[in-house]
Curated annotation (Swiss-Prot):
High-level lineage: Viruses, Viruses incertae sedis, Naldaviricetes, Lefavirales, Baculoviridae
SUPFAM superfamilies found in the cross-reference section: Cysteine proteinases (SSF54001)
Propeptide segment residues: 22-116
GO molecular function annotations of the record: cysteine-type peptidase activity
Name by which UniProt lists this protein: Viral cathepsin
GO biological process, one term: proteolysis
Annotated catalytic residues: C140, H274, N294
Length: 331
C-alpha cells in the first residue's frame, strides 16, 4: 500500500512538472489545423512554404519556452505563421515620433511601498472596459492610453464608455497613427485636441486616414493634464495603481506573442515596443504577479489579458516612465 501511495505521489509530481510540447514530426498536421482554425489563405505555394517554415520555428520556440520551468504555458495562436519582426512592426506600435513634446508633469516616486491588499484587480470592481483588437495597425499607444481614460471614467461615474482610437490615429499630429507613437505624447495631444469622442461616432478602421472630426461630435471626456511617473521600486506600482486607476505602460512584447495562460517569468527585455494597461496584481501558488490588459483580441492569452511575475522587471515593464491623464470633470 505504501509503495502504491509513493507511486501516485511521484506521478503527480511528474504530471505537475510536465512541460507541454508539440511533436515536431507532426508540424505539417499542426499547420493544416492552424490554417483551418484561423482561415489562413496564402497567395501561392511559395508563400505557404515560407509560412510553414516560420510556423516550424514557432513550434520550436514554444517548446523551448514550455521547458523553462515557467508557470506560463505557450501554445499555437493566430500569430504562429508570422515572424517576430512582422508581429512587432504590425501588431505593437510603441515608437518614437519625429516630433517630441513633453507637457506632462514628472513625478518621482521613491518612498517605501505602502501597506495594501495582497490581491487587487480593477476588473473585480467593473472598472475595466472590454478587450479590443488593434489588428495590423501599430496603434497600441492609442489603445492603452484611451483604455486608462475609460477606466478613470468608470471609476468616477460607474459607467463604461468606448472611446475612439481612430480619432487618435487620424487627429494626433505628433504621434504617427498606425506607424507608432508614445504614451505621454498621446496624452499631450489629447489636451491639444479637446474632447474625446466615442467609437460609434468615429469607428475604428485600423489604417491611417485624414482627420475626419466635423466639429459637431459629442465629446464625452476632456483631458486637461498628464503625469509621468519615475518609479524606483516596482512594488510602488501597487500604490499608484490603486490611487490613479489602470496605468498604461511600455513593454517588450517579443516574449508574450505565443502566450496562452499562467504567469510569465522569463520574458525578453531587448527594447520597448508595445503599450499595455496594468489593471491588477496578486499572488498565485506563492508567485506574485501583475495583470495586464492587451489589445490583441479576446482569443489571445487569458481572454485578452496576461500576467507576469513581479519584481523581475518582466518584459522591461519598468524601463519606461508610467503615465496617466488628468481629466477635466467640469468640462
Amino acid at each position: 500500500m505504501k509503495k502504491l501511495v509513493i507511486c501516485i505521489i511521484l506521478n503527480l509530481i511528474v504530471a505537475k512538472n510536465y512541460a507541454f510540447a508539440y511533436d515536431l514530426l507532426k508540424a505539417g498536421d499542426y499547420f493544416e489545423t492552424f490554417l483551418a482554425n484561423y482561415n489562413k489563405m496564402y497567395n501561392d505555394t511559395s508563400e505557404k512554404e515560407r509560412r510553414f517554415s516560420i510556423f516550424q520555428q514557432t513550434l520550436e520556440e514554444i517548446n523551448y519556452k514550455n521547458r523553462l520551468n515557467d508557470s506560463a504555458v505557450y501554445q499555437i495562436n493566430k500569430f504562429a505563421d508570422l515572424s517576430k519582426n512582422e508581429i512587432i512592426s504590425k501588431y505593437t506600435g510603441l515608437n518614437m515620433p519625429v516630433q517630441t513634446t513633453n507637457f506632462c508633469k514628472t513625478i518621482v516616486i521613491d518612498q517605501p511601498p505602502g501597506k495594501g491588499p495582497l490581491n487587487f484587480d480593477w476588473r473585480q470592481q467593473n472598472k475595466v472596459t472590454s478587450i479590443k483588437n488593434q489588428k495590423a495597425c501599430g496603434a497600441c499607444w492609442a489603445f492603452a492610453t484611451l483604455a486608462s481614460i475609460e477606466s478613470q471614467y468608470a471609476i468616477k461615474n460607474n459607467v463604461h464608455i468606448d472611446l475612439s482610437e481612430q480619432q487618435m490615429i487620424d487627429c494626433d499630429y505628433v504621434d504617427m497613427g498606425c506607424d507608432g507613437g508614445l504614451l505621454h505624447t498621446a496624452f499631450e495631444q489629447m489636451i491639444q485636441m479637446g474632447e474625446l469622442v466615442q467609437e460609434h461616432e468615429y469607428p475604428y478602421a485600423g489604417v491611417n486616414k485624414p482627420c475626419e472630426l466635423r466639429g459637431d461630435e459629442t465629446g464625452v471626456v476632456k483631458v486637461k493634464g498628464c503625469y509621468r511617473y519615475v518609479v524606483f521600486r516596482e512594488e510602488k506600482l501597487k500604490d499608484l495603481l490603486r490611487a490613479v486607476g489602470p496605468i498604461p505602460m511600455a513593454i517588450d512584447a517579443s516574449g508574450i506573442v505565443n502566450y496562452h495562460h499562467g504567469i510569465i517569468h522569463y520574458c525578453e527585455n531587448y527594447g520597448l515596443n508595445h503599450a499595455v494597461l496594468l489593471v491588477g496584481y496578486g499572488v498565485e501558488n506563492n508567485v506574485p504577479f501583475w495583470t495586464f490588459k492587451n489589445t490583441w483580441g479576446k482569443d489571445w492569452g487569458e481572454e485578452g489579458y496576461f500576467r507576469v511575475r513581479q519584481n523581475v522587471d518582466a518584459c522591461g515593464m519598468t524601463n519606461e516612465l508610467a503615465s496617466s491623464a488628468v481629466i477635466d470633470w467640469d468640462a
